[in-house]
Amino acid sequence: MLFARAIGGLRIACKSQISPASLLARNHQGRSLRLCQRSYSINRKMSTNGTRLKKELDPNQGGDESKKTYHKQATGEAWKTVQSHSSDNDLKLYGSCFCPFVHRVWISLEHKGLDYQYVEVDVYRKPKLLLDINPRGLVPALRHGNWGMYESTVLMEYLEDLDQGKPLLPTDPKLRAHSRLWSDHINRHIIPAFYRYLQAQDPKDQVNFGSELTEQIGKLVEAADTTGPYFIGKDMTFVDVQLAPWIVRLEKVLKPYRGWPDPEPGSRWEKWVRAIEANDAVKKTTSDDQLYLDSYERYAENRPNTSQVREAINSGRGLP
């Protein structure tokens, strides 16, 4: 059984008790310069009329600067990959480092060994370069020359159709159909269950949605090749990449926020999870743990203005 686990936070405030009068009274002492420097450091965020300047908060922080928000730059191995793909290129991936849908396309590019440029965008500011491709301002978006397209599964299919690099879809028509069927299962059932579980605030709902997610993953595992370690055998293919970002986030998000259990030792599911975690393309596009903890706190607290995904899940609609 899955159990909810509360995550607590600690807020520390510090106030200066040094008045201008006390500073003047101690001007004859050698410490005065240090005190003035300290006073300046503490109060440099004050405006000229003595009022404290407000830090610009992201909308999903709910007006509380102690709340964590999404990261705007990759970290760890993913940051190294961003740097190595920062030069201008005809093939551009526009993404946000915390987004699992971006993660899919990014893994695909790395798996195939294609030459591309990664462009980090702030989807909550919706820059024009993104809106020119996707009027809804969502990521991932891909520009290839003067042509652009969006939606993660569509982009993965497009990269396959380029017929460059290592393929993700098998050559056998039956296995291709099998892969597309279970990719659809991931999009229709596993991903919504993931967000329902993460966003649920009532402990009973968390247990129910956790069970739903476990059940939907179980169906996928039953459809997988019995030997593995990947979905249809020894090599990573389309279904693996479709699921990989959420396998990463089971460990980095659901485990700390909802107590998601480790795979049962020796199980087919454990074998699959470990293969995904050890895959080079996955590792090269995955940031450090803190990025995911911070970026998904808003989902775990079900805050307003978090994302269109959050709104769709709360209203019972399909994913945007």
Model-derived features: where do they sit?
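Surface-exposed helix-capping loop/turn segments at secondary-structure junctions
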Residues: 222-234, 256-257, 279-286
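Short alpha-helical "patches" and their helix-cap loops
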Residues: 170-173, 207-211, 256-271
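Residues at alpha-helix termini
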Residues: 112, 133, 254-258, 280
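GST-like domain detector, emphasizing the conserved glutathione-binding G-site
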Residues: 6-18, 24-27, 36-231, 300-304, ...
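GST superfamily/GST-like fold recognition
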Residues: 233-256, 264, 268-271, 276
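Short capping/connector residues at structural and topological boundaries
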Residues: 173-174, 235-236, 287
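A contiguous, mid-protein "functional segment" used to position or interact
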Residues: 263-297
